[in-house]
């Protein structure tokens, strides 16, 4: 399949993107064409006008709460006000488009895509088949009535509120590849004063395997969250009432949401709090709405759809929206996000997982940025979004060591060219969690330019975050803070007035 694209901008405020493609060999497709993203921060809950493919025009609005389905269908055009006196219209031709609320997967966007999911797929594409699509963006209105939100000469600012919310408990995963922690690694992890350590038990694991995991979590000094990933709860009855285990999750990776009957059975045989929810994303909870358990869980990663630096950073803010929506669904449950990872752990929608190969030189679960300041900055933004929501009880971040962890192992990276870590070194994200050890309260704050700089305010200390690859300066608590790319700078800001 070969294609050509054409971009055209006109003085009258119209921007057009055209694509022409032709198949030279047969293949199967799910979707093939253009996508349009509307940003969440500027459009959530805002009124819009939708034009359908049959020409009918209806008033509507961008969803405020996360929509589990498709909020806009049979789309030809969508228009909304972007500033007083200025209106934007996106027109889509060549296919039938519809919209997903991408916040379900923690993206900071609504996505307009083709082909509609309701149509059969995959679709056979034959040699000579032509695909032509056009997306146009038209701005209309009185330019004189539109004022810039900030002047380029004005400094970026962060304003701290007097409100306080509890810090959720922060935990990690024990390494899922079976790595046994060294004494030095255990010492470092003990210094984090973790709320919990997550371990995963599959049908391949025996009670002796779980005991070996518990020896490590006990050495770290943190309670254990045990995930039964398809394992029979009855096989682990010997751990009934084990004080090293705070709670269990009864999942089956072959089923998108936990069966409440399985959760109740596990509670009976294990004598502890057992939770349900989903092994996957908030999407599954939002769509299936399983019955509440005392503990409900779901996972998050920012790269279900896009992996560029800017998208990943922007997606962190959506975790706060997810947290609030999850609390609305389960007002009385203990809510845990577990785990949060940089990359997807697997593709739950792959019909042939063996063909779902990595898009980088590293395994698909591994992100080369894990050992860089980027991961620490992103994690600080993630903690900010979740903590400020006041809706989540605990969060599991990453693994203990290695490619998906907080520190490099003494043997170093298996692919040092692609994952440029130093053997035995703690990653910047470790230092962030160490600085947050024992944290109790968070004060929400607001940045004038949150895509560039933001802050996490914890127990009288501001963790000022640069979310970009450029140096930035920001005014906070009466002082100017200069930040290197993806840097975190801490300053004292005191408590509420």
Language-model features and meaning:
Residues 250-373:
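Noncatalytic carbohydrate-binding groove/subsite architecture in carbohydrate-active enzymes
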Residues 1-24, 101, 106-109:
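Extended, loop-rich substrate-binding clefts of extracytoplasmic carbohydrate-active enzymes
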């Amino acid at each position: 399949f070969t294609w050509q694209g054409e971009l055209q901008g006109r003085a009258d405020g119209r921007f057009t993107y055209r694509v022409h493609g032709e198949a030279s060999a047969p293949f199967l497709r799910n979707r093939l064409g253009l996508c349009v993203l509307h940003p969440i921060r500027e459009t959530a809950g805002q009124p819009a006008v939708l034009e359908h493919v049959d020409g009918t025009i209806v008033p509507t609005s961008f969803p405020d709460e996360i929509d589990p389905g498709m909020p806009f269908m049979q789309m030809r055009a969508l228009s909304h006000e972007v500033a007083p006196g200025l209106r934007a219209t996106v027109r889509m031709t060549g296919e039938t488009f519809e919209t997903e609320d991408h916040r379900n997967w923690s993206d900071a966007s609504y996505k307009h895509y083709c082909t509609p999911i309701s149509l059969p797929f995959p679709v056979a594409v034959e040699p000579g088949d032509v695909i032509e699509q056009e997306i146009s963006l038209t701005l209309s209105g009185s330019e004189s009535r539109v004022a810039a939100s900030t002047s380029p000469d004005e400094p970026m600012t962060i304003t701290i509120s007097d409100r306080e919310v509890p810090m959720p408990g922060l935990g990690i995963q024990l390494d899922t590849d079976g790595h046994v922690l060294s004494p030095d690694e255990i010492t470092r992890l003990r210094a984090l004063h973790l709320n919990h350590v997550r371990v995963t038990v599959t049908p391949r694991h025996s009670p002796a395997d779980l005991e070996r995991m518990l020896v490590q979590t006990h050495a770290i000094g943190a309670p254990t969250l045990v995930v039964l990933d398809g394992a029979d709860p009855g096989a682990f009855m010997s751990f009934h009432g084990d004080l090293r285990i705070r709670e269990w999750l009864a999942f089956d990776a072959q089923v998108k949401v936990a069966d409440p009957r399985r959760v109740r059975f596990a509670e009976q045989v294990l004598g502890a709090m057992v939770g349900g929810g989903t092994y996957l994303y908030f999407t599954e909870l939002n769509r299936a709405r399983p019955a509440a358990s005392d503990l409900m869980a779901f996972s998050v990663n920012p790269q279900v759809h896009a992996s560029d630096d800017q998208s990943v950073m922007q997606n962190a803010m959506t975790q706060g929206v997810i947290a609030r929506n999850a609390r609305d669904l389960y007002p009385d449950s203990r809510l845990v996000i577990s785990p949060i990872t940089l990359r997807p752990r697997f593709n739950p929608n792959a019909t042939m997982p063996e063909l779902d190969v990595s898009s980088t030189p590293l395994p698909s679960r591994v992100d080369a940025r894990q050992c860089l300041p980027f991961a620490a900055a992103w994690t600080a933004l993630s903690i900010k979004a979740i903590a400020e929501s006041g809706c989540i009880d605990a969060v599991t971040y990453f693994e203990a060591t290695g490619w998906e962890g907080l520190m490099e192992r003494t043997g170093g990276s298996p692919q040092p060219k692609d994952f440029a870590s130093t053997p035995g070194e703690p990653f910047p994200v470790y230092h962030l969690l160490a600085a947050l050890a024992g944290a109790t309260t968070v004060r929400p704050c607001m940045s004038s330019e949150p895509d560039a700089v933001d802050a996490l305010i914890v127990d009288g200390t501001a963790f000022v975050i640069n979310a970009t690859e450029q140096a930035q300066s920001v005014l906070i608590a009466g002082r100017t803070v200069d930040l290197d790319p993806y840097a975190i700078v801490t300053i004292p800001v005191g408590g509420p007035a």
